């Protein structure tokens, strides 16, 4: 198991966004997380959900606090991940959601 968070890729970003995280076309990517993470660390993972399936995971390389949500004015943390990530051959069913949820990686296939 590998601890981390799940983030849903919005439908309007399309499968092209998901593909770019795993095909080598980008070297890093930035996710946003409300507040300051109490459990998350560099080396943990962001598991990406698209169309109600976990598609893969990317390792966290930096957590940068002090950012502000431009709409609400509330604090948030920027979560920088290394790409390309590990893409699943068979996606894992997982309901998409808004925001961030901690995830223990229990469904991730053993290597």
Where on the chain are the PLM-derived regions?
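Compositionally biased, charged N-terminal/linker segments
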Residues: 1-42, 49, 74-77, 85-111
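Short, solvent-exposed secondary-structure boundary/capping segments
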Residues: 64-80
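Residue-level detector of short, conserved catalytic/binding motifs and their immediate flanks
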Residues: 44-46, 56
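Short beta-strand-centered aromatic/proline hotspots
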Residues: 55-66
């Amino acid at each position: 198991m590998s601890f981390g968070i799940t983030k849903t890729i919005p439908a309007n970003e399309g499968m092209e966004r998901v593909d770019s995280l795993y095909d080598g076309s980008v070297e890093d990517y930035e996710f946003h997380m409300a507040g300051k993470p109490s459990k998350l660390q560099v080396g943990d993972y962001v598991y990406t959900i698209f169309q109600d399936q976990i598609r893969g995971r990317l390792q966290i390389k930096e957590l940068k606090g002090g950012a502000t949500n431009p709409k609400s004015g509330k604090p948030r943390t920027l979560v920088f991940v290394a790409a390309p990530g590990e893409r699943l051959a068979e996606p894992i069913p997982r309901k998409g959601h808004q925001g961030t949820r901690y995830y223990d990686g229990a469904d991730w296939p053993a290597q």
